[in-house]
C-alpha cells in the first residue's frame, strides 16, 4: 500500500491534488496525484515504499482544507466476482498482516465517491458492509480495545467490481463514513444555510467545550444575517446576536428576544460599546479578499474573540486564492503580535466556498 485516497466534493479534485502534493513535499515525500475531473476523489501515489503510511500519520488531517478523508490504499483491485467479493478482499488484507496489525482495527467502512454517478453504489455499500464485517470478525479483526489508537479499515468502490482497499488512523481521520456528517435540517430554521454553521461548530469546536463557548452569557455579531440561518444556530445555543443586514430577519428569531436587528452594511457596522462581542460570524457573498480584510480588522481591533466565516471562491485558481486570503489574515495578526488558532475546511454543506475558524489566544 503506497497510495493515499482522499475524498472531496465533486469538482474540487484539482485543489485537493495541489494541496496534498504541497503537504507531502513539505515532509520530503514525493509522488504524483491522479486526478479524474468530477470524480469526488484523488489518488496520490508515493514514489517510495512506506511513504503513504508516513503521510497518513504525519499530515494533520484537520489541517487539510479540501480533503474529506485520508486513507492509505492498495492498487486498484478490479474484476471482483459478483458472486464473491469478500474472499479476495480478505485475502488481500491477509497479505498485509506483516506490516499492518489488523487486530488493532476497530471498524470497516465500505464507501464510494460522493457523486451523482456513484449514488447507485451507495445502497450496495451499506448492504455489503454487514456480511463483510461479520467475515472480518471471524478473522479476529475489528477487535481493537482502544479505538482512538486503532485503525479503521476502508473498502472504497470506484465501480461495483473495482475497489481500493486500505486503512486510516482513528486519531487522524474524519469520524464519519465518506467524511460526511449526517445533519438534519431543523424545521424552524429560516434557511438551509443554517446547516453550514451547525457543521462548522461541530467540526471546529470540541464537544466538551461547546456549552462554555456558546451560552446565554455570550454575545455575537452576524454580518449579512438575513434571513437568519446562521443567527438561528447561535440563538438556539443561548447566544445574544446582533444581526446585521438590510434585509428582514425571520419573525421566529425576533420572538426569541435574543436578537437585535441592525439594518446596516456589514462592512460599515461597528460593535456596540456596552458589551464585549465573543463571536463574529459571516456568510456574506463578497470577494474573498474583501472578507479576509474585514475579518482581520475585527480581530486586530479586538472587536471579537472568535470567528467563523465563509470565503466564497472564484471559478479559477481556488486553492491559490484560499492560500492568499489565509496568509493575508495571518500576516495582519502576526504584525500585531497576536496569538491565534486558525483552521479552514471545505465542509460538506459548503459549495463554492470554504469555512474558516479563528480564535484569539
Curated annotation (Swiss-Prot):
The keyword Cell membrane does not apply. GO terms for cellular component: cytoplasm. GO terms for molecular function: S-adenosylmethionine-dependent methyltransferase activity. InterPro entries: RlmM_FDX (IPR040739), RlmM_THUMP-like (IPR048646), RNA_MeTrfase_FtsJ_dom (IPR002877), rRNA_MeTrfase_M (IPR011224), SAM-dependent_MTases_sf (IPR029063). The keyword Transit peptide does not apply. It is found in: Cytoplasm. Keywords: Cytoplasm, Methyltransferase, rRNA processing, S-adenosyl-L-methionine, Transferase. S-adenosyl-L-methionine binds at residues 193, 226-229, 245, 265, 283. It is an enzyme of class 2 (transferase). SUPFAM superfamilies: S-adenosyl-L-methionine-dependent methyltransferases. Its EC number is 2.1.1.186. GO terms for biological process: methylation; rRNA processing. It catalyses: cytidine(2498) in 23S rRNA + S-adenosyl-L-methionine = 2'-O-methylcytidine(2498) in 23S rRNA + S-adenosyl-L-homocysteine + H(+). PANTHER family: RIBOSOMAL RNA LARGE SUBUNIT METHYLTRANSFERASE M, RIBOSOMAL RNA METHYLTRANSFERASE FTSJ DOMAIN-CONTAINING PROTEIN. Catalyzes the 2'-O-methylation at nucleotide C2498 in 23S rRNA. This is Ribosomal RNA large subunit methyltransferase M. It comes from Histophilus somni (strain 2336). The gene is rlmM.
